Each structure stands twice: as structure tokens, then as C-alpha cells.
Amino acid sequence: MAETLRPATAADAVECGRICFEAFASICDAHNFPRDFPSPEIAAGLLGGLILHPGFYGVVAERDGKIVGSNFLDERSIVVGIGPVSIDPALQNKGVGRALMRDVIARARSRGAAGIRLLQATYHNRSLSLYTSLGFQAREPLSVLQGKPLNLRFPGYDVRPATATDAAACDALCHDVHGFDRGKELTGAIGQGSAMVVEHQGQITGYTTGIAFFAHTVCRTNRDLQALIGAASEFGGPGFLLPTRNHEVFAWCLANGLRVAYPMTLMTIGLYNEPAGAWMPTVLY
């Protein structure tokens, strides 16, 4: 029987969380990589938050009246991010994932998104093949890094909490580096107290919504990025996502005791500019 798709509701969070936990656990365990979610309850809490967030679109797939998968779309910018997408392990490779992906891609296009992006676990061959067949192009190899906080400071690079008055400068910086801003994400992070900025010679030269799995960072130089990583009190979730091609910062992280948890790949449809600075994505883009 073909699946039916409908918008996600708050009542779906627990079941979607269970499926998400089991789906990611089965893939991670099969490839001997650490799990993304420590428990079904954590996954349900995350998905429940996305369902209720006005900046996200959620969709669930049902068969015979039972939820068998879900997908989400971050719509807070002109570039949108997909995920997490998860399918009941008993129904994987049966077209449910493709249907959920097509749904959010159609949603993004109907709303005029300039670009559509996602991060793919590099060891997962099937998802790489699926996303490529749907039109996504591999753009950037990434390494998920984790370890103890570095507690490092750099003279002349001052890191402090971001405030609402910093938003315009941070948005302009993001536009310079990426060609668009992520102002709604930044505003949310400032409100939550997780956003930080780095200042050099009296100017904001970098910001982060958190050195974490679900946070992004934009900087003018590698030294700005190192200052933000060095000042982080923790690395939230499985770790932070560093472009592996940034050899200077990648090697510096390894030399300071951080370790690679697993590799990922940034994939895109539509607008993509080679970033003109140092940066780190969220697990969505």
C-alpha cells in the first residue's frame, strides 16, 4: 500500500521520535559509528520542538493509519535546510524516504527558496544515492568533531555573548561570506543566550549560534573561527561540523585533542556560492 503524507502535529512527536531514534540507531550501528540520539525521548523532544517551531515545516508518512516516517524543512532563510528525515527501519528502501524528500523539495520550490540544502552521513551509501538522484550535488566534506572544551584565548580576538545590537553586523558578515543571511536563526540564538561574537580591532569579525551540531558559525578568517571554538564551554550534541578542506583549523583542532566522530557531506540544490571566509554549518546546512 502506498504511503499517505500529511502535515506533522504535536501529537506525532513521540511516535516520530521513536522512529527517528530507531532509524538513525540502526544505520549508525550497522556502520559502527556513534549514535546521533541517545534515546527515543531525546529524539522526540527535538522533533516536537521542530513541529511547534513557526520556522519549520514538518511532514509525516502513514501506511495503514500508522506513522512510518517524517521529514522537516527549516524555512527561516531564503536558503532552506532539510532534515532530519527518518523512516521506520522495517520499511526502508520501499520508497517512503523518496516520497518524504519530494514533498519538502516541492514545498521549498513552491515558496520560492533560492537554495535547498542538507547534510548527509558520508558512510550511508543509500542516502547519498537517493539525494543525488533527486538533484542534490555534493559540495563540501565535513568532519564532526568532539572533545573537551579547549579554553583557549587569542590576544586581540575578544569573544563575548552576542546581543540584539550585534545582529545587523552579523547578518552583513554572513551575507559577505555566503551571499545571504541567517538572521532569524541568529535572533533565536541571541534570545536563548547561545550566540557569541568575536571582535578584532573594534569590529565584529565572526559569530556563532553555538559551537554545536544544530548551530552555525560565520567568520572572516580562520583566527576568528579558532577564537570562537577555543572559547566554547561545550560542543553540543554529537559535535560541531568543520569543513574538512579547512586544513589549518582542522589540523589545529586535532592537535588540541579534538577527535573526528564521523564524516558528513554538504549537498545542495540551487543557490550555492563558495564561501568567502571561515564557516561551519548546522547539521541541516
Per-region residue spans from a language model:
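Intrinsically disordered, low-complexity, positively biased terminal segments
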Residues: 1-3, 54-58, 62-64, 89, ...
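Hydrophobic adenine-recognition pocket in adenosine-nucleotide-binding enzymes
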Residues: 8, 85-87
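Conserved GNAT-fold acetyl-CoA-binding loop/helix
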Residues: 21-46, 167-188
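Conserved catalytic-core motifs of GNAT/GCN5-like acyltransferases
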Residues: 78, 117-121, 137-150, 260-272
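Surface-exposed beta-loop interaction hotspot
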Residues: 133, 142-168
